[in-house]
Amino acid sequence: MTTTPLSPSTPSNVQVPDIQGRFGRFGGKYVPETLMPALAELETAYQQYRNDPGFQAELQQLLRDYVGRATPLYFAERLTAHYARPDGTGAQIYLKREDLNHTGAHKINNALGQVLLAKRMGKQRIIAETGAGQHGVATATVCARFGLECVIYMGVHDMERQALNVFRMRLMGAEVRPVAAGTGTLKDATSEAIRDWVTNVETTHYILGSVAGPHPYPMMVRDFHAVIGQETRAQALEKWGGLPDILLACVGGGSNAMGLFYEFVNESSIKLIGVEAAGEGVNTEKHAATLTKGRVGVLHGAMSYLLQDEDGQVIEAHSISAGLDYPGVGPEHSYLKDVGRAEYYSVTDEEALAAFQRLSRLEGIIPALETAHAIAYLETLCPQLDGSPRIVINCSGRGDKDVQTVAKFLIPQ
């Protein structure tokens, strides 16, 4: 199977940002004046190249030969049997295997697209933020491929729990800058990356790693990841002659979920479910369930749901998963929540750890802790379902990076 063009095949009534970059009341450009010309330049370049035949040809060739797309749509036979009813019926569970991409996660789809764009804009220096390290690794990878200077900002707490990915980034020539401010996690790394961009905007392109931030990033990152849903549509039609009934993905900033969802937003019969990190519980102060418990505010250049205190100050998020440990969410997810097109739930650290072990033992697939949150929601979802609906879960990344973290909590029996 070949990869499909960047432009989605979804009908034209899909909500896309307006010229101000808004999804309903969400999104926008809440940035210093210094960055407005850079965002305008980026949007102009993206609109110029997104459907340019030469750009598309290079992107598709690299996605195929360098990244390894298309990724399989895998029937999880033993996981399906685990949730089957006594009569053998029940949900049919499929995994969209983004973990099989080069670098081990979905993140390279976006990093590759943005680097090709940056090259055409004449930028020679690339910066990025990272939490779990997968976006940092993907960015370092494509910078090595094209010989570009690469600086990655990463919170000191995340560097400790993702030491393997830190080494991988440095191995490929990236400079990894520790961020000790705040909680030393993804929010703080993002803030530092934006400060760098403000200072070096003439020579530097900022590869934001999620569907967050100021316009055009939420739209652009979504579009570069839309290949996930496009392939899923084609593969589902090939495998069973229809479409999935339910799409399930973890949500931190929300890029892997939007990559899967976007192709199907106008297929009203398909349920879209995002799963956030409940941490130690949504009724504690240690969680990252932004769409479950957040209120509308502005963070990192966009209006969206945020975790805030009574004074409107952004509060610390918590998750065992570094990639979900973020107090905001992409504005398109906030829009999909408000209009009722997608549903968002949360699972705890403990539930995610159990799912991490369950998928490993039942399928021989070690998922990222982020992905494990989506897998964990099957415990709640499957008993509620009638018949044998087909569920596609975005297996957004592999869990090699998380083994040391998990080993502190799980002792294999």
UniProtKB/Swiss-Prot annotation:
Pathways per UniProt: Amino-acid biosynthesis; L-tryptophan biosynthesis; L-tryptophan from chorismate: step 5/5
Entry EC no(s): 4.2.1.20
Keywords recorded for this protein, A-Z: Amino-acid biosynthesis, Aromatic amino acid biosynthesis, Lyase, Pyridoxal phosphate, Tryptophan biosynthesis
PROSITE patterns cross-referenced by the UniProt entry: TRP_SYNTHASE_BETA (PS00168)
Catalyzed chemical reaction(s): (1S,2R)-1-C-(indol-3-yl)glycerol 3-phosphate + L-serine = D-glyceraldehyde 3-phosphate + L-tryptophan + H2O
Signal sequence, start to end: none
One Pfam assignment: PALP
Gene3D superfamilies, sorted: 3.40.50.1100
Residues bearing PTM N6-(pyridoxal phosphate)lysine: 107
Cofactor(s) the protein requires to work: pyridoxal 5'-phosphate
UniProt GO molecular function: tryptophan synthase activity
A GO cellular component annotation in the UniProt record: cytoplasm
Annotated TM spans: none
Entry's family note: Belongs to the TrpB family.
NCBIfam families, per the entry: trpB
Subunit organization: Tetramer of two alpha and two beta chains.
Biological role stated in the UniProt entry: The beta subunit is responsible for the synthesis of L-tryptophan from indole and L-serine.
Full protein name: Tryptophan synthase beta chain 2
Species of the source: Nostoc sp. (strain PCC 7120 / SAG 25.82 / UTEX 2576)
